[in-house]
Amino acid sequence: MSIAKKRKGNFLKYFLTIISCIVIFTGIGFGTLAYMTPPPPKPPVFPQLPPVGAVSAVLMDGNTGDIIAQKEGELKIYPASTTKILTCIIALEEGREKLDADAVITPLAMGQDGTNIGLRSDMPISLHELLYGMMLVSGNDAAVSVAETVGGSYGGFIQMMNEKAVSIGATRSHFANPNGLTDKNHYTTAIDMAKISRYAMGNPAFRKIVREKVYPMRYRSGVYRNVENRNEFLSNGYRGANGIKTGMTMAAGECLVASAERDGQLLIAAVYDDENRWKDVEAWFDYGFACIRAWEKYEQEMAGEPAVYKFMNQLTGKESSWEEERKRHY
């Protein structure tokens, strides 16, 4: 064999070897290995906000304090018995050393108008037990007794209420009594009441009181009375319902501050002068939880799956993973 022929044969052998390697590594014909980044997620799609019949309403994220929805949330309104939310949290904080002591029962307390639990000076009861009578069945007499026991005097407690409201950030409110009976100097806003409620729900003892469906309120004599919570979300089993207070007067209309928690996410709704308060708050709770789910899904997608290598076959135009191509050719 001539040297020229031998060189030609070797060149052909080397050439075919190189071509084979190229074919193998490019997926039989002209493929490219690309670093493919997943497309950005679509913006979250939120449901439509349901209308409510309330004159003033707010839906708050109980974890962050953010306002999710509102309707005239800063409108000046009468709070009615939702006032007792503030009365209760002050009693738990400032009167914690008096919780086991006898509550002060005066003629002023026993003479309150509206809903009462029937306090009597000859039937002593502890401050702790009285809080259930105030929050579950909305005893106006109980609220005054709580105020006089904790504040040292009626006026002293009213001062405590206004100072506490300001410290919480409820700066558009002014309180003139501990139970919410109508007074021109006793007013708030739905947003302020949501702020106060969020603050109160941060106290475990407060949460324990307002989530009770029925509580055996005991007098010192050993006699007890079952007091039932007027919160229909608790009795009807709305998912996650855990508080907090109803209210109603002629001036305020039907009022409700309610809370619900799912998977660690707390929502607080406050509606004032709303004849359909239960239906409206339920609709807003459903809306709020749906919005949170949509946002959480979006955040998860934003975090994204890690980018992966993709093999693009230039002949077929089809895309496959590098792992699939490796298995196919090796």
Label each region the model flagged.
Residues 28-36, 288:
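Structural signature of transmembrane alpha-helix termini at the membrane-water interface
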Residues 17-30:
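Hydrophobic membrane-insertion alpha-helices, especially the h-region
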Residues 1-14:
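N-terminal Lys/Arg-rich, disordered targeting/topogenic segments
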Residues 12-15, 25, 61, 68, ...:
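Catalytic-site microenvironment of enzymes
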Residues 170-171, 182-192, 197-330:
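Domain-terminus/edge residues, biased toward the C-terminal soluble/receptor-binding domains
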Residues 21, 152, 167, 290-294:
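A structural signal for alpha-helix termini and helix-coil/disorder junctions
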Residues 34-191, 195-204:
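Active-site-adjacent loops and short helices of periplasmic peptidoglycan-processing enzymes
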